[in-house]
Amino acid sequence: EYLIAKSQNGKFILRIEDTDQERFVEGATEIIYNTLNMTGLKHDEGPDIGGEYGPYIQSQRMGIYMDYAKELIEKGNAYYCFCTKERLDALKSSNDKGDAFSKYDRHCLTLSQEEIQKNLDAGMPFVIRQKMPTEGTTTFHDVVYGDITVENAELDDQILMKADGFPTYNFANVIDDHLMKITHVVRGSEYLSSTPKYKLLYDAFGWESPIYVHLPAVMRDAHNKLSKRHGDKSFEDLISEGYLPEAVVNYIALLGWSPSDNKEIFSLKELEQCFNISGLSKSPSIFDMKKLTWLNGEYIKNMDTESFYILAENRLKNAIKNTTLDLKKIATLLQKRLETLNDIPRLVDFFDSLPEYSTDLYVHKKMKTTEEIALSSLKAALPVLENLSDWTESNIHDALMSLVQTLGIKNGQLLWPVRTALSGEPTSPGGAMELADILGKEESLKRIKIGIEKLQNVL
């Protein structure tokens, strides 16, 4: 909705649709506000900022819906229904032919005006149903799916106003979309089947229908739609798992929409400028967590270092208790290696304390190292580093590279053992020089000595 509005110089309106009291969720409105704020999707009108067509909370517009429902009754396009729940339940069980109930049988359509008034005067509960045509067809146009035609005989006399005085979702939306001058109605393709009823409501009032844009479903896999009830992640879940809001927005924008080129990374501003309805697809999209994770990693890599540090600082402080370590240096190492912010604790825990590790880590085919080579390299590196008076990354680099030349070995045959001894991990953010610089001289020498001892014990 947001991109369609902005790409056509329109307004993006926030309307709280809370007329279904059975599905009302406490705190849901706050989640909507928080999500819009985090994603940068700024609405032009809404409950919090007002606008020309308020109020923007449907439960505050209750008087409006009943008036329009009664107008339809007067026009002959709707009617009162006094059927009890027991009668409707019995109807659902079977009809006269023993078939499963699929449509209301219009029992109350034939009530006389006197009977209707008598029931109303007696305070009998009622709903208001839309009177559907029983012959002919209804056709509507959808931007994505084209012209769709249904047989009117298949349409049920849907409820417009419920017995509790609240409008149904379908009816309230038609009324509010018209009154708020909504030009584009954007929703999931599962609502295609109810759109003929919308179209007939617009026709009954003599209003122009909006432009319909039905979007394909987002799937967990080839057979199942995404569903929070089945454990699929919400936006809040993704953020709590270390995904960036802008990366999630970017990825979701690409589900069911293809840009004119092969570009995959867009800022919100770029999406607003290049989005085009013509790029929407009919085919369902599969929510690929691996693709989102890759995209998130690209966003992290492309951030400026200061912005990344601000983002990562709290996680670094929670993960690393040693306050003498330079967290900014650690952040610089991490930035090019992270996929999500929640990877941080796992990647930095060795800075606090050296984990227990196997000497198998010293064996690396590509680096051409064995346990014997690793032991020899660490023994050679120890005195060189001990004699280093000015402990900086540059000086550590020069000292170790000079030692490589002296020993006549490959770079990796020295640097891999030193890196392994310093981290105790199969992989680490940063190599031997960076880790030694951050850990400091005393801790680095201590860990190298532990590495030597471990190797001596197995050789």
Describe these PLM feature segments.
Residues 1, 32, 72, 76, ...:
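Residue-level signal for inorganic ion chemistry
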Residues 184-188, 237, 384:
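Short histidine-centered catalytic/ligand-binding loop motif
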Residues 13-18, 179-185, 233, 399-401, ...:
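Glycine- and acidic
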Residues 205-359, 364, 368, 423-459:
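Catalytic adenosine-cofactor/nucleotide-binding cores of aminoacyl-tRNA synthetases and other
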Residues 71-74, 79-214, 220-226, 259:
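Active-site cores that bind ATP or allylic diphosphates and position pyrophosphate for catalysis
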Residues 1-97, 195-207:
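N-terminal Rossmann-like or analogous alpha/beta NTP/dinucleotide-binding catalytic cores
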